[in-house]
Amino acid sequence: MAASGPGCRSWCLCPEVPSATFFTALLSLLVSGPRLFLLQQPLAPSGLTLKSEALRNWQVYRLVTYIFVYENPISLLCGAIIIWRFAGNFERTVGTVRHCFFTVIFAIFSAIIFLSFEAVSSLSKLGEVEDARGFTPVAFAMLGVTTVRSRMRRALVFGMVVPSVLVPWLLLGASWLIPQTSFLSNVCGLSIGLAYGLTYCYSIDLSERVALKLDQTFPFSLMRRISVFKYVSGSSAERRAAQSRKLNPVPGSYPTQSCHPHLSPSHPVSQTQHASGQKLASWPSCTPGHMPTLPPYQPASGLCYVQNHFGPNPTSSSVYPASAGTSLGIQPPTPVNSPGTVYSGALGTPGAAGSKESSRVPMP
C-alpha cells in the first residue's frame, strides 16, 4: 500500500463536521450542560424556552434561544445527533452562511406559528401545550426543504425503502420517542420547511452575492481559518467543485495498491511479440499441389502453418496459420495424404524449405 503524504487527511478516522453545525451543537451543550450536570434535580424552568408570555414580556430573544435548550440528558444526546445528521447535510448543500441564516429564519417562523397555536389552544381550553425547546423544529424545517427539492424518489428509513415524500412524516412520528420534546413545535417546523420548499420564497432568501460578501466578514472569516472543521463556501460553483473532488479524488491523494503498469497504447504489438524487434514473416504463397515455402527459424514467434488438402476440390490445398504458442510435441511421421498436416516452422530449416521431407505433426 502506498503511504499517504504527511499533509493528507487520514481516511475514515473521523467524518468532516461543518463549522456551523459544530458550533450549534457546542452552543447547545454550553447552554444546557451546566443545568443538566451541575444543578440538583428537579430543575427550575429555563428562562430561554419558548412560552406564550415571551411576547407579552417582550422577551423576543426566546424566539431563537429555545433551540439550544434541553431539559433531559437523553434529549440532549438526541439533539446532538439530529444536529449532526440533518443540519450538517443542509449546511453542505447551501453553505455555512446560508445555513446560519436559515437556522434563525426557521426558528423564528416556527416559534411564531407555535405561539399562535398555543394561544388558540389556551382560548379554546383544549389543554396545556408543552413548551417548545430543542433543535428538532429547525431540523424538520430543513428536512422539509430538502425533501421537496430533492430529485430522489426513494430513501432508506429504518431499513425500509420508502418514497422520499414520506420520510419527514415517518421521522415526525418517531420524534414522539424523544423525551420532553414538543410535538406541536415539530409540526410547525415541518410546515415551514415544506412551505418554503414549494413556494421558493425569494423575498426572505439570501442571495449568493450577499453570502459571498458575508464569507469575508466576522465571524465567518474566523470560522474559515479553523482547519479542523469544514467551512462550506457560499459559492455554488465552489460547492460543486468540492463535491466533484470528493467523488473523483486526485490521483495520489488516497492510498492505492501498487500493481504492474499496463502496456501503453504507444507500444506496437510487434514489440510484445518479438523481443528483438523483428517483424513477423509474411504469409507464404501456395499453389494447388505445391508444398508451401516455410519461413526461417523464429523461436520467439512460435508460428506454424497448417496445410489442408480438402479445399474446394480434392487437389487444392489451403494454408493458414495455427494458434501461436500451441505445442503438441514431435510425433512420428504420418502419410502425406493425411486429412490435416502441420508443417512446423520451428522444425524446418532454410535448406529444407523447398523439399517435401519437412517434419509433419498431425492435428487432432
UniProtKB/Swiss-Prot annotation:
Q: Which family does it belong to?
A: Belongs to the peptidase S54 family.
Domain of life (superkingdom): Eukaryota
State where composition is biased (Polar residues). 267-276, 317-329
Query: Per the UniProt record, which residue ranges are transmembrane?
Result: 11-31, 63-83, 100-120, 158-178, 184-204
Asked if the keyword Cell inner membrane belongs to this entry, the reply reads no
Q: Which organism is it from?
A: Homo sapiens (Human)
In the UniProt record, what gene is named as encoding this protein?
RHBDD2
In its UniProt entry, what is this protein called? Rhomboid domain-containing protein 2
Question: What does the record list as coiled-coil region(s)?
Answer: none
Gene3D superfamilies (alphabetical): Rhomboid-like
